[in-house]
Design a protein with these regions (language model features):
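Residues at the starts of beta-strands that form the adenosine-phosphate
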Residues: 3, 27, 96
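Adenosine-cofactor binding site in Rossmann-like domains, unifying the SAM/SAH pocket
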Residues: 22-46
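N-terminal Rossmann NAD(P)H-binding glycine-rich loop of SDR-like oxidoreductase domains
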Residues: 2-23
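NAD(P)H-binding glycine-rich loop region in Rossmannoid oxidoreductase-like domains
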Residues: 41-78, 103
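SDR active-site strand-loop-helix element
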Residues: 7, 31, 59-60, 97-103
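NAD(P)-cofactor binding segment of oxidoreductase domains
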Residues: 70-98
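Helix C-cap/helix->beta junction micro-motif
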Residues: 24, 51, 92-94
Length: 103
């Protein structure tokens, strides 16, 4: 069975993807900011190694420009380092031939 990891599953895009995948025979792993801190490389690697997803869909991000300007370091950590950490997991677990999606 295909295993899909939706990172940021509680957001608008994550919830929409869950609705699409729900009727399919796919195991969905949902994480949000309360369950997993994507800015922490070791935490992301640990989750990936334990669960070994076939596909990673990154629905995380701080899109509010005012928020990004108020706290640029946090915005950078989530938007850049978080995406980097997920790509490290994808590469480490599956190599270049396995998909990872970033919204």
């Amino acid at each position: 069975m295909l295993k899909v990891w939706i990172v940021g599953s509680e957001g608008q895009i994550g919830e929409a993807i869950n609705e699409v995948l729900d009727p399919l025979e796919i195991e969905v792993l949902n994480t949000d900011k309360n369950a997993l801190d994507i800015t922490e490389t070791d935490e992301v690697l640990h989750f990936g190694e334990i669960n070994r997803p076939d596909v990673i869909i990154n629905c995380t991000g701080i899109t509010d420009t005012d928020e990004c300007e108020k706290n640029p370091e946090h915005a950078y950590r989530v938007n850049a380092l978080g995406a980097r950490n997920l790509s490290i997991v994808a590469r480490k677990l599956r190599g270049k031939d396995r998909p990872a999606f970033h919204r």
